[in-house]
Amino acid sequence: MSGLQGPSVGDGCNGGGARAGGSCCRRRCFRGFGRRVQGAAFPGRQPAELGPVPRGLPAAAAPVCPAASAAAAGGILASEHSRGPSAAGGHPGPAASEPVLPPLPGPQRRATPGHTGCLSPGCPDQPARWSEWPGPSGPPGPELQQPGDTAGLCPADARSGCALAVSQLPL
């Protein structure tokens, strides 16, 4: 295997590629074989479509694997991502399939399905169920409770009186 033999597992393809400047998106190492398979990371896309890194740019500008990009966005090195618990905290990082999102601006209290809260500002003592609100996996924005919100109620329902509005909520 003279032309196909590549570096062993743990070099530029398995986690270290994003940090060392290699591109694991262009070539993927398979465990046990120790060889690179061109274009395996993106079916239907050839490595040439990814394009080389222009001269003068740092090696970090090279395309990297999506899992490594997500790990970098969360402050986790790709090598920690693939090896389990990190040396710093002893806790494993997020799974490669979990999106790493920046915190949303504004109030961070989220109205989750089935969560119990209070209507505000008119009747703070009346509990309300937010079951009709979008869950945490929905689009950001409408599911965040803003000051003065009535939990998932239409403005007309909220104006008609607290007792009536609460009685119409599904339990």
Curated annotation (Swiss-Prot):
Subcellular location per the Swiss-Prot or TrEMBL entry: Cytoplasm; Cytoplasm, Cytoskeleton
Disulfide bonds: none
Keywords on record: Cytoplasm, Cytoskeleton
Spans annotated as Disordered: 1-22, 76-156
Signal peptide (UniProt feature, chain positions): none
PTM notes: Cleaved in vitro following UV irradiation to induce caspase-mediated apoptosis and this cleavage is inhibited by a broad-spectrum caspase inhibitor.
Composition bias type Low complexity, residue spans: 84-99
Record note on quaternary structure: Interacts with calpain-2 catalytic subunit CAPN2.
Protein name per its UniProtKB record: PIDD1 alternative open reading frame protein
Organism, as annotated: Homo sapiens
